[in-house]
A protein has these predicted regions:
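Residues within well-formed alpha-helices
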Residues: 5, 45, 80-84
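A structural-propensity feature for long, helix-poor, extended segments
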Residues: 17-53
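A conserved C-terminal secondary-structure "cap"
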Residues: 38, 51, 55-132
Length: 132
């Protein structure tokens, strides 16, 4: 089960595009139970997303993959949410191709991930274009 889920989630940042927009792994929410499907599928999909982000900053990783459903992305407004959805799609493709080319690839060093994320999103952010 872990291996199947592993293939659906983007657990590692292999490069700076991922690190520029999302700090850490892009999580994969669990499958809804039959009871959750029967008693409010849409509401419970949202509940499972919230559950997935317990103890995490949802704005540091503004996306989630819902197993057997698909991606969700958000932002401070609709334009940023769409931008984050596009980034998610590109990062997913890059991770897939990277793992196909080199299955034992190592993630980018944490210091590189930190530099790329915090220079755009940290308290002293100085780099990158703001989504307007």
């Amino acid at each position: 089960e872990y291996r199947r889920q592993r293939q659906m989630c983007i657990r590692d940042s292999y490069g700076t595009t991922h690190a520029d927009y999302m700090y850490g792994e892009i999580p994969c929410a669990r499958v809804l139970t039959q009871e959750e499907i029967d008693a409010g599928y849409e509401k419970n999909t949202g509940t499972v997303i919230i559950e997935t982000f317990e103890g995490k900053d949802p704005m540091a990783v503004p996306a989630v993959l819902c197993k057997n459903h698909g991606p969700f992305a958000w932002g401070k407004d609709a334009k940023e949410a769409v931008h984050n959805a596009v980034v998610l799609e590109e990062v997913a493709k890059m991770a897939l191709f990277t793992e196909q080319l080199k299955p034992d690839v190592e993630p980018a060093p944490q210091r590189i991930q930190d530099k790329h994320y915090y220079r755009k999103h940290g308290a002293n952010a100085y780099y990158g274009n703001k989504v307007e």
